[in-house]
Amino acid sequence: MAAVTTDLIRELRERTSAGMMDCKKALEENNADIEKAITWLREKGIAKAAKKAGRETKEGRVVSYIHGNGKIGVLVELNSETDFVSKNEDFEALGKEICMQIAAMNPLYLNEESIPAADLEKEKTIMRSQLEAEGKKADQIEKILPGKIKKYVSEVCLVNQAFFKDDSKTIDDLVKEAIAKFGENITIARFIRFQVGGL
């Protein structure tokens, strides 16, 4: 298998505007063949989604979901570029899927950028203490910590969570697929989850 170098990742990123991790995965899946990686990204809709990511999303809708027992409710603001897309049944279905994800998985934040710095620092401190208690040395801790933080982010941030119906993709992947399908940018603006007896 050919090596995936940073130069290859950079070139693929420049040619497709896809994210660095998406480019790396595309190259790994295609034996470092850049042309096949571009095709792979296009098939996945990632290249298309990345190109549309900068566009403003001024239209949209608020989608709601009440869990069967009536004890959990979710509201999601899902935005699109045009009202044509936001009025589409598939757009509403996407919103429902995201609502059910929130009801089931209870994310605390939308994305990594929305985690308050103090909260992230607190988690890092807890993780460091746990690793020290396990007898890990300082240099080992610094190597282990990024992986633990990534796992934490994938648990508490909606867009990083594995999709509850198909854990081979994240909510971010689900949105990118919708962007490719609709041909315009779609964003999750915010969400709120209510639970009887919860805060």
From Swiss-Prot:
Cited InterPro entries: EF-Ts_dimer_sf (IPR036402), Transl_elong_EFTs/EF1B (IPR001816), Transl_elong_EFTs/EF1B_dimer (IPR014039), Transl_elong_Ts_CS (IPR018101), UBA-like_sf (IPR009060)
GO molecular function: translation elongation factor activity
The organism's place on the tree of life at top rank: Bacteria
Annotated Pfam families: EF_TS
Subcellular localization(s) per the UniProt record: Cytoplasm
Keyword tags: Cytoplasm, Elongation factor, Protein biosynthesis
Region span, Involved in Mg(2+) ion dislocation from EF-Tu: 82-85
Keyword Iron: no
GO cellular component annotations of the record: cytoplasm
GO biological process, one term: translational elongation
Signal peptide (from-to): none
Coiled coil spans: none
Keyword Glycoprotein listed: no
Family the UniProt entry places it in: Belongs to the EF-Ts family.
PANTHER family with a match to the protein in the record: ELONGATION FACTOR TS, ELONGATION FACTOR TS, MITOCHONDRIAL
Function in brief: Associates with the EF-Tu.GDP complex and induces the exchange of GDP to GTP. It remains bound to the aminoacyl-tRNA.EF-Tu.GTP complex up to the GTP hydrolysis stage on the ribosome.
HAMAP family given in the database record: EF_Ts
Protein name: Elongation factor Ts
Annotated organism of origin: Leptospira interrogans serogroup Icterohaemorrhagiae serovar Lai (strain 56601)
Encoding gene per record: tsf
